[in-house]
Curated annotation (Swiss-Prot):
<keyword id="KW-0540">Nuclease</keyword>
<feature type="modified residue" description="Phosphoserine">
    <location>
        <position position="689"/>
    </location>
</feature>
<dbReference type="GO" id="GO:0003690">
    <property type="term" value="F:double-stranded DNA binding"/>
</dbReference>
<feature type="modified residue" description="Asymmetric dimethylarginine">
    <location>
        <position position="572"/>
    </location>
</feature>
<keyword id="KW-0832">Ubl conjugation</keyword>
<dbReference type="GO" id="GO:0007131">
    <property type="term" value="P:reciprocal meiotic recombination"/>
</dbReference>
<dbReference type="InterPro" id="IPR038487">
    <property type="entry name" value="Mre11_capping_dom"/>
</dbReference>
<feature type="modified residue" description="Asymmetric dimethylarginine">
    <location>
        <position position="594"/>
    </location>
</feature>
<dbReference type="GO" id="GO:0000729">
    <property type="term" value="P:DNA double-strand break processing"/>
</dbReference>
<feature type="modified residue" description="Phosphoserine">
    <location>
        <position position="641"/>
    </location>
</feature>
<dbReference type="GO" id="GO:0070533">
    <property type="term" value="C:BRCA1-C complex"/>
</dbReference>
<keyword id="KW-0378">Hydrolase</keyword>
<dbReference type="GO" id="GO:0043066">
    <property type="term" value="P:negative regulation of apoptotic process"/>
</dbReference>
<feature type="modified residue" description="Phosphoserine">
    <location>
        <position position="701"/>
    </location>
</feature>
<dbReference type="GO" id="GO:0042138">
    <property type="term" value="P:meiotic DNA double-strand break formation"/>
</dbReference>
<dbReference type="GO" id="GO:0000724">
    <property type="term" value="P:double-strand break repair via homologous recombination"/>
</dbReference>
<feature type="compositionally biased region" description="Polar residues">
    <location>
        <begin position="599"/>
        <end position="614"/>
    </location>
</feature>
């Protein structure tokens, strides 16, 4: 687009483009806690000052999948401050909005809502940090969409086939087909592209008159054989691709010579990892589109915290460092000190005249100490810069360059290997699980479960806090294996069962689509179980509170009545306290309601725990046994019902210990009863609470009761 065409008129779209804001990153840090909020304020202010038609976000608006109340509140506050007003919106929507926003309860663009006064619409896809999760598949963007501040588009409702329907925009004579695809696991999306399961729909009328703009949030650089999306997978009719997820700022559009479209990679607006890609200056883009022509003007962000990074190799300075010198460590420290001082001077020099930039910069010095050198204490060294840098704990990163064996194929990027990932973009949980089982010994290999399924379950457990994900996957694959063995009518011999299980597992591993269905079904079960647990927990807590309140009220009434009778009979000798025997009895009597309530609650808890334990101990061989051979659970319930009848002296011994002889006799009686109660408990599948917190396979409801 020429300079004359770039002039704003009624036919020119002005779009502010940004990605990977990661709102709420390190919000609890005393120094860096407000960095993301300040930068979002600057981005929205730039949109208002440049009078853009709308804001386009490429995913990862939030850093956490479940952002905190502070993060959500600040985001809503800033969106209301800058995006609401009386300035009219100059473009219109031509496409069917019920298709573009069909997953929303309000399937229309927010500025056309009669109850809202929007001056700058915000269009956004979701990223891998704020993607939909849970039984209802909701994400943080859905909250903003329901509130009317963000238009969430590009969401795929199917995991088997994706049809991307564009949002059709028109301003004057300029028409834009806005395509969006929210974050999907790269391996799955890669396979869908290979199998021709991704379709980008085009307008039926005069399709060549539209400017095709595509927003995607996936790995662009190659992290594995299928753990990225090649640019060649995208359709060649696209004019411009806004690529999110990659944090290095490459906002200037570059042309793909094979597909003949342009790619703009805005990068993140906040430093989330101390890696070389984050050291590039941060920008947002002001995109102008007129007809089929475009112009991208990059705008530097002035509120981003400075980040300086430098690498040194000790072996490259033989004149300064000798590993045989006993004082070589002091020499290395002095050399590192000089390098850091130089970076701090550069930071102070660049910060002159910019009052909006944070005072303390981020500094990272990577030291290659291969060649016989030894690292020094980083914590002690960092104490010198506590008041001068924002990351005093990890200023220096020591690494050793190890020689790799010669391999055929592409070279290994050692820069990525030595960079410590901090947000899971280069090192993922499921890859670690897969790598572990591939290199593990034969006796610890999985024989029933699959590596892929376990990797997905562990990822859900770690990243999305789905505490039942691992347990439900194990249950689902176990049930499926049991059904397979029953259908084959295998003899109940351990050797034959093991052989059939291995054969069945290999068959499932080859069928990747079936394995994906298994993982999805298990995750759906886990999310549904979490929702049911939360509802039952809230109802259970309400019942407990009511029973405790009633018990306390009955206890207080009992105390008052007994105390009144005591005062009347004994006169002034004991006052309100009453006699020892009566007082002791009244206390025991007043606690009767509490004792009954607590024991009933404990009984319910133990019975539920027994049921869970019984289901967990279910093995494959048990599937061939008749249900009549299984022990009845009524016996256990009967034992507990006998334990419920406890004299009030048991509770008195635990709550109000005394030293009188009578109380000592009660104490011995109570001790014997408590021992008998514990013996009955040991007769059931009793689980110690010491290891429950570390057990990811434990039921969520059991964990909640143990924490009480």
């Amino acid at each position: 687009m020429s300079t004359a065409d770039a002039l704003d008129d009624e036919n020119t779209f002005k779009i502010l483009v940004a990605t990977d804001i990661h709102l709420g990153f390190m919000e609890k840090d005393a120094v860096r806690g407000n960095d993301t909020f300040v930068t979002l304020d600057e981005i929205l202010r730039l949109a208002q000052e440049n009078e853009v038609d709308f804001i386009l976000l490429g995913g990862d608006l939030f850093h956490e999948n479940k952002p905190s109340r502070k993060t959500l509140h600040t985001c809503l506050e800033l969106l209301r401050k800058y995006c609401m007003g009386d300035r009219p919106v100059q473009f219109e929507i031509l496409s069917d909005q019920s298709v573009n926003f069909g997953f929303s309860k309000f399937p229309w663009v927010n500025y056309q809502d009669g109850n809202l006064n929007i001056s700058i619409p915000v269009f956004s896809i979701h990223g891998n940090h704020d993607d939909p999760t849970g039984a209802d598949a909701l994400c943080a963007l859905d909250i903003l969409s329901c509130a009317g501040f963000v238009n969430h588009f590009g969401r795929s409702m199917s995991v088997e086939k994706i049809d991307i329907s564009p949002v059709l925009l028109q301003k004057g004579s300029t028409k834009i087909a806005l395509y969006g695809l929210g974050s999907i696991p790269d391996e799955r999306l890669y396979r869908m592209f290979v199998n021709k399961k991704v379709t980008m729909l085009r307008p039926k009328e005069d399709e060549n008159s539209w400017f095709n703009l595509f927003v995607i949030h996936q790995n662009r650089s190659k992290h594995g054989s299928t753990n990225f999306i090649p640019e060649q997978f995208l359709d060649d009719f696209i004019d411009l691709v806004i690529w999110g997820h990659e944090h290095e700022c490459k906002i200037a559009p570059t042309k793909n010579e094979q597909q003949l479209f342009y790619i703009s990679q805005p990068g993140s607006s906040v430093v989330t990892s101390l890696s070389p890609g984050e050291a590039v200056k941060k920008h947002v883009g002001l995109l102008r589109i007129k007809g089929r022509k475009m112009n991208m003007h990059k705008i530097p962000l002035h509120t981003v915290r400075q980040f300086f990074m430098e690498d040194i190799v000790l072996a490259n300075h033989p004149d300064i460092f000798n590993p045989d010198n006993p004082k070589v460590t002091q020499a290395i420290q002095s050399f590192c000190l000089e390098k850091i001082e130089e970076m701090l001077e550069n930071a102070e020099r660049e910060r002159l005249g910019n009052s909006h930039q944070p005072e303390k910069p981020l500094v990272r010095l990577r030291v290659d100490y291969s060649g016989g050198f030894e690292p020094f204490s980083v914590l002690r060294f960092s104490q010198k810069f506590v008041d001068r840098v924002a990351n005093p704990k990890d200023i220096i990163h020591f690494f050793r360059h190890r020689e790799q064996k010669e391999k055929t194929g592409e070279e290994i990027n050692f820069g990525k290997l030595i960079t410590k990932p901090s947000e899971g973009t280069t090192l993922r949980v499921e890859d670690l699980v897969k790598q572990y089982f591939q290199t593990a010994e034969k006796n610890v290999q999985l024989s029933l479960l699959t590596e892929r399924g376990m990797g997905e379950a562990v990822q859900e457990f770690v990243d999305k806090e789905e505490k039942d994900a691992i347990e439900e996957l194990v249950k689902y694959q176990l049930e499926k294996t049991q059904r397979f063995l029953k259908e084959r009518h295998i003899d109940a011999l351990e050797d034959k069962i093991d052989e059939e299980v291995r054969r069945f597992r290999e068959t499932r591993q080859k069928n990747t689509n079936e394995e994906d269905d298994e993982v999805r079904e298990a995750m759906t079960r886990a999310r549904a179980l979490r929702s049911q647990s939360e509802e039952s927990a809230s109802a259970f807590s309400a019942d407990d509170l009511m029973s405790i309140d009633l018990a306390e009220q009955m206890a207080n009434d009992s105390d008052d009545s007994i105390s009144a009778a005591t005062n009347k009979g004994r006169g002034r000798g004991r006052g309100r306290r009453g006699g020892r025997g009566q007082n002791s009895a009244s206390r025991g009597g007043s606690q009767r309601g509490r004792a009954d309530t607590g024991l009933e609650t404990s009984t319910r808890s133990r019975n539920s725990k027994t049921a869970v334990s019984a289901s967990r101990n279910m093995s494959i061989i048990d599937a061939f046994k008749s249900t009549r051979q299984q022990p009845s659970r009524n016996v256990t319930t009967k034992n507990y019902s006998e334990v419920i009848e406890v004299d009030e002296s048991d509770v008195e011994e635990d709550i109000f210990p005394t030293t009188s002889k009578t109380d000592q006799r009660w104490s011995s009686t109570s001790s014997s009863k408590i021992m008998s109660q514990s013996q009955v408990s040991k007769g059931v599948d009793f689980e110690s609470s010491e290891d429950d917190d570390d057990d990811p396979f434990m039921n969520t409801s059991s964990l909640r009761r143990n924490r009480r």
